[in-house]
C-alpha cells in the first residue's frame, strides 16, 4: 500500500484565513510520523532525485529537516539546514521567503560557489519558500543539481514562470475540505 497517498487522504484540513491547509506528519509533524511512511518517502526520493556528484543536501527549516536527515543517512551526503535564525558567520547569506500564510527571513550557511546541491522540502504550495531558496543558491553560485518536494499542492505557484523545475512525489489539491490526489506519481 502507498502510505503517502493514504496518509494524505486521511489528513485533516484547517483554514488559515482564506487558505485551506492540510495537517500532515510530513508537513507539520502531527499527527505522529510513522517510520514506514518516512522510509517510503526516502526511498522514493532516492529513486527520483539525481544524486550523481551531489556535495550537499540543502533544506529549509523546519519541516524539511526530518526528511533530509533520513536521505543524508541513506546516501552519506552532508546536510545543510537553512535556518530562520541569523548567526552572523562568514559567508552567511540571507533570503526573504513569503508563503500563503507567513513570511520572514532565512539564512544559509555552508553553501559556497560551485557546490553541487540537492534541494529538498516537504511541500510546494505557493512556491514562496522554494523560489527564495533557489534564487539565493543561484546568487551564491551553487549548482542546483536537483530539487524535490514531497507534496505539491496543485495550483499556480511562484516557480511557474521561472527556470527552476521541482520534482514532486505526489500532487494534491484541497476541495471541499478534503485532500484530492491529482497525480499519485508527482512531477518528474
UniProtKB/Swiss-Prot annotation:
E.C. number(s) listed in UniProt: 2.4.2.-
Domain of life of the organism encoding this protein: Archaea
Entry keyword annotation includes tRNA-binding: no
GO molecular function: transferase activity
SUPFAM superfamilies per UniProt: PRTase-like
Keywords, in A-Z order: Purine salvage, Transferase
Top-level EC class as recorded in UniProt: transferase
One BP term from GO: purine ribonucleoside salvage
Cross-referenced HAMAP family: Hypx_phosphoribosyltr (MF_01467)
Function as written in the Swiss-Prot or TrEMBL entry: May catalyze a purine salvage reaction, the substrate is unknown.
PANTHER family, sorted: HYPOXANTHINE/GUANINE PHOSPHORIBOSYLTRANSFERASE (PTHR43864), XANTHINE PHOSPHORIBOSYLTRANSFERASE (PTHR43864:SF1)
Family: Belongs to the purine/pyrimidine phosphoribosyltransferase family. Archaeal HPRT subfamily.
Name of this protein: HGPRTase-like protein 1
Amino acid at each position: 500500500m502507498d502510505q503517502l497517498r493514504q496518509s494524505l487522504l486521511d489528513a485533516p484540513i484547517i483554514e488559515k484565513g482564506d487558505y485551506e491547509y492540510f495537517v500532515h506528519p510530513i508537513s507539520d509533524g502531527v499527527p505522529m510520523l510513522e517510520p514506514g511512511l518516512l522510509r517510503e518517502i526516502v526511498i522514493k526520493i532516492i529513486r527520483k532525485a539525481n544524486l550523481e556528484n551531489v556535495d550537499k543536501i540543502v533544506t529549509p527549516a523546519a519541516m524539511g529537516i526530518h526528511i533530509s536527515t533520513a536521505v543524508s543517512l541513506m546516501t552519506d551526503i552532508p546536510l545543510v539546514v537553512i535556518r530562520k535564525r541569523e548567526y552572523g558567520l562568514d559567508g552567511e547569506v540571507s533570503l526573504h521567503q513569503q508563503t500563503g500564510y507567513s513570511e520572514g527571513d532565512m539564512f544559509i550557511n555552508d553553501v559556497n560557489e560551485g557546490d553541487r546541491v540537492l534541494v529538498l522540502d516537504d511541500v510546494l504550495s505557493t512556491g514562496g519558500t522554494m523560489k527564495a531558496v533557489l534564487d539565493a543558491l543561484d546568487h551564491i553560485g551553487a549548482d542546483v543539481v536537483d530539487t524535490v518536494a514531497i507534496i505539491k499542492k496543485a495550483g499556480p505557484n511562484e516557480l511557474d514562470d521561472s527556470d527552476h523545475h521541482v520534482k514532486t512525489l505526489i500532487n494534491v489539491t484541497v476541495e471541499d475540505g478534503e485532500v484530492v490526489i491529482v497525480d499519485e506519481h508527482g512531477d518528474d
